[in-house]
Amino acid sequence: MPNWCMNTVTITGDANKVAAIEAAAKNDSLLEHLAPIGEWDYGTAVETWGTKWDIIGPDVQIEEDGKTMHLNFDSAWGPPTEAYEKYIEKNPDMSIEASYYESGMCFIGWYNSSEELNESFEIDFADEDWRDDIPQDLIDDWGLDDEYENWKEWQDDEDDD
């Protein structure tokens, strides 16, 4: 069973393409739509999508103009940035911005096709300087200060046992 990576994504561009992506996301086949692999194969999925399976639990909102979609979902083990890259290669008129947080494996990051940005950061709450290398926007967006406080409480409880 995988750790689940939480993802938040904004996709912008042609309204017809956004509608097609929306339909795929609601059918739990977003990644197959963005970067088709046909019959599922573990190695092909990881190489093409960056994750083992397609997404689960999508929450989709479309802006009124139909050209922007906001999407939250979980993916297995890590974010599907490879699928984003493959989609953008074939659809340069579209843009994808994403951020993600995987609490079990302790990493966070973001992707932005317009800025050619794809960065991941390790989270080590045991290091008092854990914030130093992580952009503040990511810390705020994913509530890492609260996560850190919860971690400290858990550590205190462990020490009391």
PLM segments and residue spans:
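Long, contiguous binding/interaction regions
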Residues: 1-161
